[in-house]
């Protein structure tokens, strides 16, 4: 029975097997603005690594989600506001000026400055990765 379950694991839980083989970045989004984010999406739609995070009220933080630790999978965040949609292309906001994120956990905190999004990337060193 145990051998059968081990052989079936890649079929039953392909994401779990994939996550163990590749470095992972855990992300969440925080609304640090005074305006409601009516909808938030993050990721790369063409590779099915995009995540629908739903609405975020001011001060609210989304759930954690995991993506491969490759820039393309966490480079874009789209935020729907009451009258417009904004897209943030994340290329220069990483800790210590790095071009990509190291595997780990991060909060993407967004504020609005005029008609633009401002991102602060917060490494979450003391947290543990939540269950998927």
Enumerate the predicted regions with their spans.
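N-terminal export leaders
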Residues: 1-10
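Hydrophobic h-region of N-terminal signal peptides that target proteins for export
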Residues: 9-19
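Intrinsically disordered, low-complexity segments enriched in small/polar residues
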Residues: 20-63, 67, 76-132
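Extracellular Ig-like/FN3 beta-sandwich strand-entry sites
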Residues: 72-74
């Amino acid at each position: 029975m145990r051998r059968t379950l081990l052989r079936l694991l890649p079929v039953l839980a392909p994401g779990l097997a994939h996550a163990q083989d590749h470095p992972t970045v855990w992300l969440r989004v925080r609304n640090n603005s005074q305006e409601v984010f009516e909808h938030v999406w993050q990721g790369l739609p063409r590779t099915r690594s995009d995540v629908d995070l739903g609405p975020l009220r001011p001060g609210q933080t989304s759930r954690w989600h995991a993506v491969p630790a490759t820039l393309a999978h966490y480079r874009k965040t789209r935020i729907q506001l009451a009258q417009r949609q904004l897209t943030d292309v994340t290329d220069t906001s990483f800790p210590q000026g790095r071009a990509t994120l190291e595997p780990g956990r991060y909060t993407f905190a967004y504020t609005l400055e005029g008609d633009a999004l401002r991102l602060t990337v917060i490494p979450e060193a003391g947290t543990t990765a939540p269950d998927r």
